[in-house]
Amino acid sequence: MNKQLAAFLRQFESTGSSEADRYLGCHAAEDGFVFRVWAPNAQRISVTGDFNFWNEEDLPMMPVGGGIWEAVSKFAKRGGAYKYCVTGADGTKVYKADPYGNRAMPLPETSSVIDPPEKFRWTDAVYRRNKLRQTSLQRPVNIYEVHAGSWKRHDDGSYLSYTELAEQLI
């Protein structure tokens, strides 16, 4: 078991980990994309998607410890659709979207989309320093709530990305 997995499992098993999405789901890797899912009672899991012509035998996942399964694909591409093919303890096979996926296909499709987050470089050091000098009573309150999935969509029915939503909201 590698150090990253061991550290994640310690946190995940003790608290459920509010940052599980940093390890589970689909992430860019040196040699393609890595897929990880927590399914402690599964007999078998594979990743199936348009990158392997939805062949459930093509990319089997391996159990790596703590109920976590993992597979790496060098053929998967950003924007491609995928699902997990899970064989349960009773032998039943089901196709599941990624519970930690960052994007989903527009309805009625139920696939996840390969769209891992990119590294973001923060440039707000001055703002954060100034913010620490004031109490919350000295700062204005800004509250705006919007449901990202239903507020606005592209003409083809697909969802806006968080970046696209931010451009229109801010």
Kindly give the residue locations of the regions a language model identified:
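Solvent-exposed serine/threonine-rich low-complexity stretches and specific carbohydrate-binding patches
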Residues: E56-V64
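Short proline/glycine-enriched turn/loop motifs at strand-loop junctions of beta-rich domains
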Residues: W38-I45, K77
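A broadly conserved detector of short glycine/acidic/proline-rich loop/turn motifs that flank catalytic sites
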Residues: A39, F51, H147
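The feature marks proteins involved in alpha-glucan
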Residues: M1-V34, P63-E145, S150-G157, E164, ...
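Short beta-strand elements bearing conserved aromatic residues within extracellular beta-rich modules
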Residues: I45-V47, Y82
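Beta-strand-enriched, solvent-exposed domains that form extended recognition/catalytic surfaces
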Residues: W38-P40, W54-E56, A71
